[in-house]
């Protein structure tokens, strides 16, 4: 590949890295706390963050388990 082709490729890669979409990690977390887990099933990853859960549910971590749960609110 010629040096011009390499420079073009490098420029396109740089532009692509700058234009990647904003991740859900940049969003604020949903309100409330995760309720306690009543039992210990095998490791399951149902979600990665709150925004992968429907409605007001939160992505709750219990050890190696990630699941969508209704939040609890503590006064």
Curated annotation (Swiss-Prot):
Belongs to the venom waprin family. Its main location: secreted. The keyword Signal applies. GO terms for molecular function: serine-type endopeptidase inhibitor activity. It holds the Pfam family WAP. Keywords: Antibiotic, Antimicrobial, Disulfide bond, Secreted, Signal. Residues 27-72 form the WAP domain. It is found in: Secreted. This is Porwaprin-c. Expressed by the venom gland. PROSITE patterns: WAP. Damages membranes of susceptible bacteria. Has no hemolytic activity. Not toxic to mice. Does not inhibit the proteinases elastase and cathepsin G. Disulfide bonds join 34-60, 43-64, 47-59, 53-68. InterPro entries: Elafin-like_sf, WAP_dom, WAP_four-disulfide_core. GO terms for cellular component: extracellular region; extracellular space. Residues 1-24 form the signal peptide. One of its GO terms (biological process) is innate immune response.
